[in-house]
């Protein structure tokens, strides 16, 4: 199911954080948003999943304004992995992931065998099945991030919103997690920090600066030496491998 944001504006007091920003995700594509710290990437995601309320503009999901979408219906279709996943109550890893099934369980009914199968499959995908009975609070930051992704996968969404999903992960798990997300074959809108990983896994990239989209398109046409200088203020030499990996030499 498709997502379209058109001319979205958001301000804090007199400071404009998002300035007539437009992005879209469709056709089961992996779309990434890149840009320097403070440019509004996370703020955009929060406006999409309604933690923040935009000042103006349209956010449409599957042809319907998100303002008209009931929260439970939205939770069946849209999953979020936020940048920080600190939770103050403890439960098992399995029960934490089972929370992803909540929107699909009718009121006053219990989880089914199928729900538990979905949870186990999600834990298997992120390499955490062997820790299913562990205390969630005993996990490392990276393990908690993988559990958060498993919970999102267990929702079986058609749109996945990711805010730096590889935060706290070593490079092996960064690659594995992004490949898992890619293999879901659903619409993905991801805020990423690592430019090279974004180029490797993204079908389309938006480059943000100061609340606006400065560049957009396929990785090889968007991530250029000029764009890197304009957006990040750095000079670099950029080459591409045949399998769409960007090699960036900072100079």
What would you call each of these model-derived segments?
Residues 135-139, 143:
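Conserved ABC ATPase signature
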Residues 154-158:
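A short, proline-enriched helix->beta-strand linker immediately N-terminal to the Walker B motif
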Residues 160-164:
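Catalytic Walker B motif of ABC-type/P-loop ATPase nucleotide-binding domains
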């Amino acid at each position: 199911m498709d997502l379209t944001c058109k001319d979205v504006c958001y301000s804090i007091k007199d400071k404009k954080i998002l300035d007539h920003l437009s992005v879209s995700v469709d056709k089961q594509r992996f779309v990434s948003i890149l840009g320097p710290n403070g440019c509004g990437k996370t703020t955009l995601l929060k406006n999409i999943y309604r933690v923040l309320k935009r000042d103006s503009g349209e956010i449409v999901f599957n042809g319907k304004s998100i303002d008209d979408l009931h929260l439970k219906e939205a939770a069946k279709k849209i999953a979020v992995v936020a940048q920080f996943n600190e939770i103050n109550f403890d439960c098992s890893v399995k029960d934490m992931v089972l929370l992803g099934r909540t929107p699909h369980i009718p009121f006053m009914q219990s989880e089914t065998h199928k729900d538990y199968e979905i949870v186990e499959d999600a834990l298997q995908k992120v390499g955490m099945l062997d820790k299913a009975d562990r205390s969630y609070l005993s996990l490392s930051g990276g393990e908690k991030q993988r559990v958060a992704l498993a919970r999102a996968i267990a929702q079986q969404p058609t749109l996945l919103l990711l805010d730096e999903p590889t935060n706290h992960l070593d490079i092996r798990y960064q690659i594995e997690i992004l490949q898992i997300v890619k293999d879901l074959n659903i619409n993905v809108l991801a805020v990423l920090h690592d430019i090279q990983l974004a180029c490797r896994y993204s079908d389309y990239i938006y480059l943000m600066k100061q609340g606006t989209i400065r560049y957009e398109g396929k990785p090889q046409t968007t991530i250029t030496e000029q764009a890197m200088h304009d957006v990040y203020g750095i000079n670099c030499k950029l080459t591409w491998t045949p399998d769409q990996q960007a090699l960036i030499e900072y100079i």
